[in-house]
């Protein structure tokens, strides 16, 4: 697990490097599907002092199997998403400014241009609010459940992120690095959408044919963007 712990540590350290977190407001995890184990950031540990060996290993029930610290308080959310979506290899949660602003506004981040379409096949959805019972009960687990409810039958790697109403963004990918990459993109397109709608409040969504072209040339069966 040492290699995966190092990868998760590096991915967590990318959050402050890319300006996605303040203090300890974020976490990254990754899963070893063969072993059924997840590596995740320890709860409340400052990035300035954190080391790879501080990463916490938990099983799919959330039991700590390796590590000196308690795992992130959002662990149950991560585990619920891993259980539901076998294609996920890494998950990120932050309170990045612009994506969180859309979450607090209760609005999906609209797909307005090709930067968005290169990564997200449509709007980045916003969940419904959790009920008082859901919050007072198994809050973090129910956060995962409301994300799954909102995604429905969507392919999660075609919609590699979401904003949870009144909370903040979650992003995911094929591994921890990919999940952080998608979290960075989500923050950037959230900022772009806010600016664009401020300039033109009547701005329409990106044309569907342009959306399809940009997403499929990177992610479709005949993708040709980048190097093989």
Curated annotation (Swiss-Prot):
Superkingdom classification of source: Bacteria
Residues annotated as binding substrate: 26-27, 43-44, 72-73
Active-site residues, Swiss-Prot/TrEMBL: 118, 225
Pfam family name, one: Aldolase_II
Pathway noted in the entry: Cofactor degradation; L-ascorbate degradation; D-xylulose 5-phosphate from L-ascorbate: step 4/4
Cofactor binding, note field: Binds 1 zinc ion per subunit.
MF terms (GO), sorted A to Z: aldehyde-lyase activity; L-ribulose-phosphate 4-epimerase activity; zinc ion binding
InterPro entries according to UniProt: Aldolase_class_II_sugar_metab, Aldolase_II/adducin_N, Aldolase_II/adducin_N_sf, UlaF
SMART domains according to UniProt: Aldolase_II (SM01007)
Cofactor: Zn(2+)
Keyword Metal-binding appears in the UniProt entry: yes
EC number: 5.1.3.4
Induction remark: Induced by L-ascorbate. Repressed by UlaR.
Function per UniProt: Catalyzes the isomerization of L-ribulose 5-phosphate to D-xylulose 5-phosphate. Is involved in the anaerobic L-ascorbate utilization.
Protein family: Belongs to the aldolase class II family. AraD/FucA subfamily.
Protein name: L-ribulose-5-phosphate 4-epimerase UlaF
Naturally occurring in which organism (per UniProt): Escherichia coli (strain 55989 / EAEC)
